[in-house]
């Protein structure tokens, strides 16, 4: 997962910070804690880079470091991380309707999740609800996609 520092007005302030917050939340939910070594491994970055970003996230009031517990999200950090995760899940659910390969979905969502506006996300959520409740409509879309292939 590439780390760029492009600004994102919708979340923490940068794509890289979003990725860290999302990863920290994932680790906490999975293991009960988020250690820098685990963050480093999962993001494919050096521990020095992770330490620097954790200091930045701490300065922004998004994380704290607790002895024996590792990195924990502040209430504000958890709120942002949850919004990022929810956005990721909505985009993933939407693309799965169209039988797109999982690795393609993953890479597409990683790019889109940082830049999608709230208005666009709301529209996608509405479409997801319709596709879930109207399978015949989804079948029509899939037929149309098949004709375009």
Where do the protein language model's features map onto the residues?
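Residues within the alpha-helical elements of helix-turn-helix
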Residues: 42, 80, 97
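Short, Lys/Arg-enriched N-terminal segment that forms or immediately precedes the first helix
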Residues: 1-12
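Helix N-cap / loop-to-helix initiation motif
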Residues: 46, 99-103
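Basic, amphipathic "hinge/linker" alpha-helix immediately C-terminal to the N-terminal HTH DNA-binding motif
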Residues: 69-88
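N-terminal positioning helix adjacent to the helix-turn-helix/winged-helix DNA-binding module
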Residues: 16-19, 35, 76, 87, ...
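Canonical helix-turn-helix DNA-binding module
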Residues: 36-67, 75
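C-terminal regulatory/oligomerization modules of transcriptional regulators
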Residues: 110-149
């Amino acid at each position: 997962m590439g780390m760029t520092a492009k600004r994102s007005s919708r979340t923490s302030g940068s794509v890289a910070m979003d990725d860290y917050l999302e990863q920290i939340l994932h680790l906490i939910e999975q293991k009960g804690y988020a250690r820098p070594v685990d963050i480093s491994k999962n993001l494919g970055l050096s521990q020095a880079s992770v330490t620097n970003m954790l200091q930045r996230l701490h300065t922004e009031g998004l994380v704290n470091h607790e002895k024996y517990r590792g990195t924990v999200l502040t209430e504000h950090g958890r709120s942002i991380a949850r919004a990022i995760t929810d956005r990721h899940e909505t985009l993933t659910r939407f693309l799965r309707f169209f039988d797109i390969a999982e690795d393609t979905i993953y890479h597409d969502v990683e790019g889109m999740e940082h830049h999608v506006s709230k208005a666009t996300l709301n529209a996608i959520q509405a479409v997801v609800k319709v596709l879930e409740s109207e399978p015949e409509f989804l079948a029509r879309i899939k037929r149309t996609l098949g004709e375009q292939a």
